[in-house]
Each structure stands twice: as structure tokens, then as C-alpha cells.
Amino acid sequence: MMDVNSSGRPDLYGHLRSLILPEVGRGLQDLSPDGGAHPVVSSWMPHLLSGFLEVTASPAPTWDAPPDNVSGCGEQINYGRVEKVVIGSILTLITLLTIAGNCLVVISVCFVKKLRQPSNYLIVSLALADLSVAVAVMPFVSVTDLIGGKWIFGHFFCNVFIAMDVMCCTASIMTLCVISIDRYLGITRPLTYPVRQNGKCMAKMILSVWLLSASITLPPLFGWAQNVNDDKVCLISQDFGYTIYSTAVAFYIPMSVMLFMYYQIYKAARKSAAKHKFPGFPRVQPESVISLNGVVKLQKEVEECANLSRLLKHERKNISIFKREQKAATTLGIIVGAFTVCWLPFFLLSTARPFICGTSCSCIPLWVERTCLWLGYANSLINPFIYAFFNRDLRTTYRSLLQCQYRNINRKLSAAGMHEALKLAERPERSEFVLQNSDHCGKKGHDT
């Protein structure tokens, strides 16, 4: 029967030694001519075999189950001084730019009258969520990363930090999802959707986004799935059920909705492009009506001039709709693309981690986790600049605020809007046609 050591585990080394040493001794006696072992061999052979068995039996601790805090839990990286300066500068720059960009959005919409419309309330909600990430989350992650990954802010604040991180990031993602739905309805239902697009409706949508984001935050605080938190680690709960629920609600469902909305807008833009080819209008020819009665001829030409005016208005409307659809498709495509590139690696890692490492800790290399996390945070940085790039009013307001030109911002926006409307009203290739036919109609009207 195998011996058991003081820890209650089988004494593998002692068992092997008791079996092998007597057999080796008898073998040596058989090899000796006089039936006895050589004195030198008898003296060193047991020690040699003992050393061999100690080496070969040294993996015996594999009988022990690995502790819960091994395989990456509490992993730390010791950065040099230069590395700390470089990493700290990059993380600080990301944080400050995120704060500045989202503050510009909030100030622009709240203080510029033309921008205070219900459709922009969603952009303000997005900016507030991204601003919360920059103020309440990024600084603590930056400090933790600079000291090598060790959590130093205590057990209580770990739960508060995770709650803020999850809620703000989820609110940002879900607001992007609602914005995509808003853009889709604005394009596909231009006549009916603006009626429902009022302040109360937008307020309810924004409130729903934040409540749903909070629903992901609350379970670990009320005992469903405890966060991983000790002296070194502050990690969101790795419970299988909670991981699937939180990642699905916070990312996979919103991403699916955004992709579907983008596809629908893209399809509408292509359909509009095929429909509105604008082949041109027939010219008004004085000789087109031949009649012996001059009154009938004049009446026909007046009707053609009236038809020309209606056709011009219809073409301008079609051009406006077409350009709006194309702009919405381009904007939403860039938003969805940036969102996917920033957040997809992090959520794939978060979903797979419990199944790879178990529920007690993380075995993923720290640098991989932090890279994916900061890539997701970068989405909060680029959102304000994406909207400013495609929104002329926001772009003009940004420029005025950065140049400290606070007066007459609304007047500048109105003038820029009128200039853009006049610019898009008539395409250059139709200007000659419009002038020729307008002169002809004006001449006929003067002759009457």
C-alpha cells in the first residue's frame, strides 16, 4: 500500500525508493564474482539512485490543484522609466482629447440655438456618456497601467469603478445604436418621422438607454455575480451566465442593430441613385406648337413654362433627398466601422475569457487585455470628431468656440446654411438650360 505524507497525498518518492533500491542491490550482488557487491559501489550507488529519484520525482507537486490566483491573476508588468513616460503621455493625451472633444459637443448643442433640436439630444447623450468614461474611468485605468497592473484603490472602490465603467461604456454603445435607428427613420420616413421626433420622445429614448445600461451594472452589486477583487486585481465578474448576458446586451445586440440599419440606409441610397438619374427636361421650343391662332400658341407656351417651373422644383427636391441619403449612409458607415474596430476585440476577449481561464481569474496576458480595453476607450475619443466632420453646423460651432468667437454663432450658421442651400439647389450642368428657358419664358411673358 502506498504511503501517505503529512499533507494527505501519496508519497510517490518514498514508494519508488522502497521498490527500486533493494532490486538494484541484489543486481549488484549477482554481478560480483564472489556474490557480494564491491564496497565502493555499495557506498555510492544508493546515494546516486536517491538523487536520481529525487530529481525524477520532483514534479510530484502536480498532484496539487493550482491556486485560484495563479495563471495571470495579479499579473504585473515592471515598466522602465522611459516606458512609463511614453505610456503615461499617450494615455493622458487620449483622456484629455476625449474630455475636450465631448465638452465641445455638449457646449455647442446646449448654447447654440440652431443646434438645440431633438435629433441632437442623442448626440448630447452620447457625448455625456463618453465624457463620463474619460472623467470617471480612464484616469484610474491609467494609474493602474502605469504601476504595472496592480489595483491600489481598495475593494469598495473596485465595485464602484466597475459599475461606472460598464454603465458609461454601455450607454455610449447603445446611444450609437439608437442614433442609427433615428437616422434610418429620418431617411426612410421623412414625412411621418419628424412629427414623432420631439423633445419628449427623445428624452424617453435617452432615459431607456441609461436604464438598460444600469441593468447590466447592478447584478454584481446585488450578489448575482461577484466581481473578482483582491489586493492586486479588480476584474468584472467572470460568471458564465452574467458574461453572456452583459456582452450580448452591451455589444452584440447593438452591433447587430447598427449593421442592419446601415444596410437599410445603404440600400435606400442605392435605390435612390438608380431612381434619380435626372436625364433632363425638354427644352421649350417656340416652334413646338404650330397654329393659325396666335392665342392658342401663346397659351401652349405659357403652360410649358409652368411645367418647367414645377419640374425644376421637383428635381431640386430629388437632388436634396438623394444627397441626404448618401450623406447618411456615409456617416453611419464610418460610425459603424469605427465602433466595430474599437470594441469588437475587447468584447470577443471578454466573452471567451471565462471559458478559457475559468471564473476565478483571468489568464490572458495583461498587455493584451489593456490594449483591447484602450482601443475600446478610443471610440469615446473619435465620436465627437466623426460627427463634426460630417455635420457642417457642429464644425462651424467648434471653430468659433476654439477661436473664442462666441458672438453671432447662430448668424454664422444661418448664413452657412443659406449658402449651402443655394449651392445645392442647381447643379452646374443645368445652369445654362435653366437660364435659356427662363429667358424664353420671361420674353413671352413680356410680349403678352
UniProtKB/Swiss-Prot annotation:
Glycans are attached at N5, N69. Thalamus, hypothalamus, and the hippocampal rudiments. InterPro entries: 5HT_7_rcpt (IPR001069), GPCR_Rhodpsn (IPR000276), GPCR_Rhodpsn_7TM (IPR017452). A lipid is attached at C404 (S-palmitoyl cysteine). One of its GO terms (molecular function) is neurotransmitter receptor activity. The chain crosses the membrane at residues 87-111, 122-143, 156-181, 202-222, 241-263, 330-355, 367-390. Keywords: Cell membrane, Disulfide bond, G-protein coupled receptor, Glycoprotein, Lipoprotein, Membrane, Palmitate, Receptor, Transducer, Transmembrane, Transmembrane helix. Disulfide bonds join C158-C234. Serotonin binds at D165. GO terms for biological process: adenylate cyclase-activating serotonin receptor signaling pathway; behavioral response to pain; chemical synaptic transmission; circadian rhythm; detection of mechanical stimulus involved in sensory perception of pain; dopaminergic neuron differentiation; G protein-coupled receptor signaling pathway, coupled to cyclic nucleotide second messenger; long-term synaptic potentiation. It is found in: Cell membrane. G-protein coupled receptor for 5-hydroxytryptamine (serotonin), a biogenic hormone that functions as a neurotransmitter, a hormone and a mitogen. Ligand binding causes a conformation change that triggers signaling via guanine nucleotide-binding proteins (G proteins) and modulates the activity of downstream effectors. HTR7 is coupled to G(s) G alpha proteins and mediates activation of adenylate cyclase activity. Specificity for G(s) G alpha proteins is determined by the length of transmembrane regions 5 and 6 (TM5 and TM6). This is 5-hydroxytryptamine receptor 7. It comes from Rattus norvegicus. The lineage of its organism: Eukaryota, Metazoa, Chordata, Craniata, Vertebrata.
